[in-house]
Amino acid sequence: MTRTFLALIFLLLTAVACPAGQHPLTVTRTADDFYAAFDRDILIKTKFCSVQAFQEKALLRSDLFGELVFMDGTRCSVDTVYVRKRLQWGTHKVTVTREEEGIYSLAGSETLLFASRCSTLALRDEAVLEMQDSLSGILHLHGGTCRVEGVFEAISY
């Protein structure tokens, strides 16, 4: 009974501190229109946002409009929110399209590969994704390789 009461008090206090639909994050711009909250395993795709952010505090608002609000008051419309996904260990044949430098989408899904510093162009090109563990791996594309630091799947927010 006491544990339940304490848990209820905790929930009430945190609800007051963070209004519904507002999620505090620390974000870094990883590519044009992409911001990562590495500590939360979240990747955010914005619409025409040019804020140069490195470990900047921001609020992800998941209300009707969907915005990423920076502490200086700058607001960016959010297109899609992605969360880290685990893939089965091993080799996967995939079809990829480069969205931005270091960001590749997998054909037929709402999944992105985050491969920073990878600039190989691709437009629905065949590739091999070699997952070394369930979270990271190597993308073999056009005879080159890129280190995949994360696989992210779109969520409704």
Model-identified regions with their sequence ranges:
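Positively charged n-region of N-terminal signal peptides that target proteins for export
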Residues: M1-T4
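Bacterial N-terminal signal peptides
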Residues: L6-A15
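Weak global preference for isoleucine
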Residues: I9, I42-I44, I103, I138, ...
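Short, flexible, surface-exposed loop segments at domain boundaries
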Residues: C18-T26, A53-T97, L123-Y157
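N-terminal secretory signal peptides
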Residues: A20-S62, G90-G108, L112-L113, R117-T120
